[in-house]
C-alpha cells in the first residue's frame, strides 16, 4: 500500500519545511513538492509532521504483571501519544535475564502496535547469558532499589557486566551516578543513565561526560515536583522520587545546554487500587502524555521543536543504534507523528488507552497534541481511534 501525506509542514533537523511525504512498503520513499498518486492520502494542512517518537524506557509489564499493562494496551497508549518505537525494561515476572525469557518476551511482544526492542536484565550470576544475548538495546543494571528484585550489590559482578556489555543502562541515583561514570571510563562500554532527577546528579554528569556517556530525563521530573505529592500522594510516587523546584530548573537547563541526551517516559503503570494500598508500588504511566506535555512547554518557550525531536527521536535512535529510525529521511522507516499545535484539550483518565486508566496529569489542559501516528507506513492512531496493526521488533546497526 502507498500513502501520501500532503500539505503538511515537515520537521527535518528542527527546520520546518513544506514537503509532501510519499510512503511505499513501510518506507519513506520520497520527500517532494509534487502530489504523487497513492492508494491513500492524508491531508495534513495546518499540521506538522515529525519523526515518530522513540521511548527508550518503558515497563509494559508482560509477562507476569498484566493486570497493570501488556504489550497491546501499552502500545495503544504509546501510539496515542505519538510514540512509534519503545524499548521495554526487564523487571517483569519472571525477569528478562536469560535467553529463554528474552525469546518468550519476543513472542509476547508480537501483538504490539508500535515497534519494540528490549533491555536485558543483569543479576549476580547471569554474565554467561549477557554474553550470549543478541539484538538487545542494552544490559540494564539496577544500583538502587525499584520495582522487582534485580538490584546488584557485588562490586565484582558490576565491573564484570560493564566489561562485557556494549551498552549498559543504569538505574543509579546520587553518588551511584558518579560510580557508573568511573566504571565506564575504566571499560570500553557505553553508559545510559536513566531518569536523572537532581542537580547533584547533573553535576556528576557534567564533570564526567564524554561521547560514550548519555543521560535521560523523564517527563514527571520535568513537570512535577515534590510539592505535588501533597495533592497526588501515592499517584506521584516513583523511583527516583520527585525533587525540588531547584532540581527541576536544573533539568530544564541541562536540556538546553546539551547535558541531557534523551527524554523518555519510564512508563510504569499500576492499577488505581494498587496505588491506594498501604504498601503501594512506585511508578506512574507516561506514554500518552509525554508529547502533549512537551508541545505545551514548547508553546511556553521552555523547549524548541528541534530539541524535542532531537531528544525523543534522533538521539534515542543514535544512542541505541536503532536502524532507519529517528529521522524523516528517504529510505528510512515510515514512522511518523502528525501534530496539531492548535489542538487544546484536557487530559482525562477515562479517555486513556493505558490499562491502569489514570495519569498524574489528569485535568491538565495542554495545547499541542499528536493527531495521527504512522508505524511502518500504517496508520495506527488517527483522531482518537486505534487501528490494530501489529508492528515489529527493531533492527540495530552493527
Task: Show the residue positions of the predicted features.
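C-terminal cap of metal-dependent C-N hydrolases
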Residues: 8, 333-396
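Metal-associated gating/positioning segment near the N- to mid-region
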Residues: 47-110
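Histidine-rich, glycine-flanked metal-binding segment
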Residues: 1-4, 9-51, 385-387
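Histidine/acidic residue-rich metal-binding segments in metalloenzymes
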Residues: 128-263
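His/Asp/Glu-enriched, well-ordered alpha-helical/loop segment
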Residues: 175, 179, 183-188, 262-263, ...
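Histidine-centered catalytic micro-motifs
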Residues: 52-63, 169-172, 217, 265
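A glycine-rich helix N-cap at a beta->alpha junction
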Residues: 107-122
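Short, acidic/polar
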Residues: 68-75, 123-133
Amino acid at each position: 500500500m502507498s500513502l501520501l501525506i500532503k500539505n503538511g509542514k515537515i520537521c527535518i533537523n528542527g527546520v520546518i519545511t513544506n514537503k509532501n511525504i510519499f510512503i511505499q512498503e513501510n518506507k519513506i520513499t520520497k520527500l517532494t513538492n509534487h502530489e504523487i498518486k497513492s492508494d491513500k492520502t492524508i491531508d495534513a494542512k495546518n499540521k506538522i509532521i515529525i519523526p515518530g517518537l522513540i521511548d527508550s524506557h518503558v515497563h509494559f509489564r508482560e509477562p507476569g504483571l498484566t493486570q497493570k499493562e501488556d504489550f497491546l494496551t501499552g502500545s495503544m497508549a504509546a501510539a496515542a501519544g505519538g510514540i512509534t518505537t519503545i524499548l521495554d525494561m526487564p523487571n517483569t515476572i519472571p525477569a528478562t535475564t536469560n535467553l529463554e525469557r528474552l525469546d518468550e518476551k519476543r513472542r509476547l511482544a508480537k501483538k504490539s502496535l508500535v515497534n519494540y526492542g528490549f533491555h536485558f536484565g543483569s543479576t549476580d550470576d547471569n554474565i554467561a547469558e549477557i554474553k550470549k544475548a543478541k539484538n538487545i538495546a542494552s544490559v540494564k543494571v539496577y544500583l538502587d532499589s525499584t520495582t522487582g528484585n534485580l538490584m546488584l550489590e557485588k562490586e565484582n559482578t558490576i565491573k564484570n557486566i560493564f566489561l562485557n556489555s556494549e551498552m549498559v543502562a543504569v538505574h543509579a541515583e546520587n553518588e551511584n551516578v558518579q560510580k557508573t561514570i568511573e566504571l565506564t571510563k575504566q571499560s570500553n562500554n557505553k553508559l545510559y543513565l536513566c531518569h536523572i532527577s537532581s542537580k547533584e546528579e547533573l553535576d556528576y554528569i557534567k564533570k564526567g561526560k564524554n561521547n560514550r556517556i548519555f543521560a535521560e530525563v523523564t517527563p514527571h521530573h520535568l513537570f512535577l515536583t515534590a510539592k505535588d505529592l501533597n495533592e497526588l500522594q501515592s499517584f506521584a510516587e516513583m523511583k527516583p522520587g520527585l525533587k525540588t523546584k531547584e532540581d527541576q530548573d536544573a533539568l530544564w537547563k541541562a536540556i538546553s545546554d546539551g547535558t541531557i541526551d534523551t527524554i523518555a517516559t519510564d512508563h510504569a503503570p499500576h492499577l488505581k487500587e494498587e496505588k491506594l494500598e498501604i504498601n503501594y508500588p512506585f511508578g506512574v504511566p507516561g506514554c500518552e502524555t509525554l508529547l502533549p506535555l512537551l508541545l505545551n512547554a514548547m508553546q511556553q518557550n521552555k523547549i524548541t521543536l528541534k530539541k524535542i525531536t532531537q531528544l525523543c527521536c534522533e538521539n534515542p535512535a543514535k544512542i541505541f543504534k536503532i536502524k532507519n529510525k529517528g529521522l524523516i529521511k528517504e529510505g528510512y522507516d515510515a514512522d511518523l507523528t502528525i501534530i496539531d499545535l492548535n489542538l487544546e484539550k484536557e487530559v482525562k483518565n477515562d479517555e486513556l488507552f493505558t490499562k491502569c486508566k489514570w495519569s498524574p496529569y489528569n485535568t491538565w489542559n495542554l495545547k499541542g497534541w499528536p493527531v495521527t501516528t504512522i508505524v511502518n507506513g500504517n496508520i495506527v492512531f488517527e483522531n482518537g481511534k486505534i487501528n490494530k496493526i501489529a508492528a515489529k521488533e527493531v533492527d540495530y546497526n552493527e
